[in-house]
Regions:
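ABC ATP-binding cassette signature C-motif
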Residues: 3-251
Length: 251
């Protein structure tokens, strides 16, 4: 991957969404060179919208998202859609990269394509095989920042481990949306989570993120218990200090 600016993706006071539908606001985040961040959140919280806003495919509602100097982004979904289904793997690599058959076989071997696999038409490949192919092409295209939306969907364990190994070895920057917590724990050194219209930043892997969430939940529970105690005490004091009704005298 080519060298790029230290600040790869920059978000400043960013609000994302569509029209009146705000998905997240007040986002101030910077992804630096070599960092691998995973974007988490429940369905519909705006993960893909954030990716598309960063890539300039969706306009921000407020603020801005910038891509650093000399940053070359490889977007998994786009490359996936651009594959020519009629070409064989060998044709694709010879035409697009000018590789010899020997070099093509060696590159594809690293992604678990062996023997006659090189003569398969791209359209006949399984979802997992296509995912491995796209990852290889992104790196060959010179991308130094990979943006991946659910890259391990439809992958078997072996294919997933191959993708994990490729991303771990990749010396550029990665931003990935994934529901696969094992995959996220293997590759991410930073977690961004969209929740309650905010993007929270955890500087560590998935295990670290879980620990932090647990601590936050415990703190919240403690705070709630303390507030409840204060409320009960205040109520007690109010009752104690309330003027007592004077019994009427019976003549």
């Amino acid at each position: 991957a080519a060298e790029c600016a230290d600040r790869v993706l920059i978000m400043e006071d960013l609000t994302i969404g569509y029209g009146d539908n705000v998905l997240a606001k007040g986002i101030n985040l910077t992804l630096r060179r070599g960092e691998k961040a995973a974007l988490l959140g429940a369905n519909g919280t705006g993960k893909t919208t954030l990716l598309k806003t960063i890539l300039g495919e969706v306009d921000p509602l407020k603020g801005r998202a910038k891509i650093g100097n000399r940053v070359q982004i490889g977007y998994f979904s786009q490359t996936y859609e651009r594959l020519n289904p009629k070409q064989t793997l060998l044709e694709n690599f010879v035409i697009e990269y000018g590789f010899t058959e020997e070099h093509t076989r060696s590159m594809l071997g690293g992604m678990l394509f062996h023997g006659d696999d090189v003569f398969k038409e791209i359209g006949t490949l399984s979802g997992g095989q296509k995912a491995r192919l796209v990852l290889l092409k992104l790196v060959l295209d010179g991308a130094n920042c990979l943006v991946l939306d659910e890259p391990t969907n439809h992958l078997d364990i072996m294919a997933r481990e191959t993708v994990e190994a490729a991303l771990t070895a990749f010396d550029g920057t990665v931003l990935v949306v994934s529901h696969d917590r094992y995959f996220v724990n293997e590759i991410a050194d930073r977690i961004w989570e969209i929740e309650d219209l905010e993007v929270k930043d955890y500087k560590g892997n998935y295990e670290f993120y879980q620990e932090e969430r647990k601590k936050q939940a415990e703190l919240l529970a403690e705070r709630e218990a303390e507030l409840e105690k204060q409320r009960a005490y205040a109520e007690q004091q109010t009752k104690k200090n309330a003027p007592q009704a004077v019994p009427e005298k019976v003549e």
